[in-house]
Design a protein with these regions (language model features):
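Membrane-embedded segments
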Residues: 1-64
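Active-site neighborhood of phospho(di)ester-bond hydrolases with catalytic His/Asp-centered motifs
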Residues: 5-11, 35-42, 66-69, 117-120, ...
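Acidic/histidine-rich helix-loop elements
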Residues: 12-21, 44-52, 89-98, 151-163, ...
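Solvent-exposed loop/turn segments at secondary-structure junctions
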Residues: 12-15, 42-46, 71-73, 87-90, ...
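Conserved beta-sheet core of the metallophosphoesterase superfamily
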Residues: 28, 122-200
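Binuclear metal-dependent hydrolase catalytic cores centered on His/Asp/Glu-rich metal-binding motifs
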Residues: 56, 60-63, 75-116, 126-127, ...
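Short acidic-hydrophobic surface loop/beta-edge motif
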Residues: 69-76, 169-174
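Short beta-strand-to-coil "C-cap" segments at the C-terminal boundary of structured domains/repeats
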Residues: 202-207
Length: 207
């Protein structure tokens, strides 16, 4: 594949088995392929001040780190607003306040008309993304539901509990599409069943 951009939607490192060197080696190869854009996940929040060492190395490698920021990327014909939300675990807010916090962040960005892509680690806040008229959300966090039951889906996901609503694949509501990657890691539960790791390829067509 020859992608125009590569996006990483958090949990580049595992707070339980952290190896920044491995993550940076991957990044150094990825930036040779295409421009890379990155947002944090909960595991980055959980490693404390070590995160800033990781971020510095990402920036040195040429990665664009989006922490509650919006930028515009363009080609010869079209432009896209690319939005990056920091994982809510970086804040001191209680979990039940995280949804309203993310909603306020998006509102305060004063997003313009036009196609908008949001990078956000957390799929469970899909309703917030829909409310803010995001066209495409790229997310992760759910590990594909860890164990997948045929015709039912994932069994468990962080912050969603058993039989999560947003575990993997595409979700559509109003004018918003969300794609949740199963990712390539395991984290706390070191086993996947019927749940192959994946790297998602998205192709956009202008109208």
């Amino acid at each position: 594949e020859n992608p125009d951009i590569i996006v990483i939607t958090g949990d580049l490192v595992d707070s339980n088995h952290m190896d920044i060197d491995i993550a940076i080696k991957f990044i150094q190869q990825a930036v040779k392929i295409s421009p890379c854009y990155y947002v944090t996940g909960n595991h980055e929040a959980w490693i404390g001040d070590i995160y800033y060492e990781l971020e510095e190395q990402l920036l040195d490698a040429g990665v664009t780190v989006l922490r509650d920021e919006v930028i515009t990327i363009s080609n010869d014909k079209d432009s896209i607003q690319l939005i990056g939300l920091d994982d809510p675990d970086f804040s001191d807010q209680a979990p039940y306040l995280q949804e309203s916090m993310l909603e306020a962040k998006l509102y305060n960005m004063n997003l313009k008309d036009g196609f908008k892509i949001l990078l956000s680690h957390r799929p469970e806040f899909f309703g917030v993304y829909v409310k803010n008229d995001i066209d495409l959300v790229l997310s992760g966090h759910a590990h594909g539901g860890q164990f997948r039951i045929p015709f039912i889906g994932g069994v468990i996901a962080p912050n969603q509990g058993f039989f999560p609503k947003y575990d993997a694949g595409e979700y559509h509501e109003a004018n918003t599409t969300m794609i949740v990657s199963r990712g390539i890691g395991n984290s706390i539960i070191p086993v996947r069943i019927n749940n192959r790791p994946e790297v998602v390829i998205v192709q956009l067509y202008s109208q």
